[in-house]
Amino acid sequence: MINVLLVDDHELVRAGIRRILEDIKGIKVVGEASCGEDAVKWCRANAVDVVLMDMSMPGIGGLEATRKIARSTADVKIIMLTVHTENPLPAKVMQAGAAGYLSKGAAPQEVVSAIRSVYSGQRYIASDIAQQMALSQIEPEKTESPFASLSERELQIMLMITKGQKVNEISEQLNLSPKTVNSYRYRMFSKLNIHGDVELTHLAIRHGLCNAETLSSQ
């Protein structure tokens, strides 16, 4: 039996995935979490084989949760299931320790196939995302996102900023000082040749890394 943990801040999304998996032989949803922090705690305290992880959630988010789970419970396989499929996120997520990467638009059978594949020790990346990653290696000048220059920590903080989170919130959730968070912010601004959080969010929207409605919280 493959024990699966569902991690998404939208209850309807979790309910939909649970419904898909509940009739699949050999797969059992054993728990749910609505944020990255709870997912990390759940994996440390319970027996779970595969985590279906959302990227954008309150708190530390899916990228940092993936990194923490991969470091502390290496036998747990993580599949990022997200609307964010543009470079450089897939590569960054896989580098953080994920075993799979799927779009939330994936067919139910592909989700099942991904769970079984990563449980057996393989990696699973949706074909369209894998093609995009391959093209970025072959023709980087045509496909590379400006965000590819960011470190994993900078990318994580960028995603939190685009969700409208403030420096004090980010510093508390990541156990960093506000000064350190601001250092990352200014480094990002320099790399991306921008001058503030709103401009950062506009750039992220243009490259498919966040949704336009996030601007309302800026």
UniProtKB/Swiss-Prot annotation:
Ranges of residues in domain HTH luxR-type: 143-208
MF annotations from Gene Ontology: DNA binding
A Pfam family annotated for this UniProt entry: Response_reg
Subcellular location as annotated: Cytoplasm
Keywords per UniProt: Cytoplasm, DNA-binding, Phosphoprotein, Transcription, Transcription regulation, Two-component regulatory system
GO biological process per UniProt: phosphorelay signal transduction system; regulation of DNA-templated transcription
Protein name: Response regulator UvrY
Organism: Escherichia coli O6:H1 (strain CFT073 / ATCC 700928 / UPEC)
